Amino acid sequence: MVIKVVGGIIKKENRYLIGRRGPKEKMAGFWEFPGGKLEENESKKECIKRELKEELDIVVVVGELISEYQYSYSDISYHLYFYRIDDFIGEPIPIVHDRLIWAKSNDFKKYNFLPGDNPLIDLMLNNKV
């Protein structure tokens, strides 16, 4: 079974919003781009709007799909979709994360990201997205 997950790439002043998974979350302590699982009968853009409202309490304008790939862990596979967030209303607050930061892409290697985010990070660091 493959689980579909949609993530949002939120950029402000050359920094990207990343969150550290809270202690009650699966894979707690790992950093990630905010997002979540696609629900039945939901479009990918509807999903990222819902997830960012639930996780960060912001309303977003969803831009283009910037990356899509499949990533498998030993016990589960994910199909990941990452959308650029063109604009947002509100100030992001950590609801499911225990910490949010605005990080420069050249600092990404300092953070312990979810392994599934690493293909996207590699693209970002090589200016491919």
What are these regions (language model features)?
Residues 59, 69-91, 101:
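Active-site-adjacent beta-strand/loop module that shapes the phosphate/pyrophosphate-binding cleft
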Residues 15-54:
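Conserved Nudix-box catalytic region and its N-terminal flanking loop in Nudix hydrolases
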Residues 1-16, 37:
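Conserved N-terminal beta-strand and adjoining loop/helix that marks the start
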Residues 10-11, 18, 87, 102:
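Conserved hydrophobic "DFG−1" position in protein kinase catalytic cores
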Residues 84, 93-124:
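NUDIX/MutT-family hydrolases
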Residues 55-62:
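Short secondary-structure junctions
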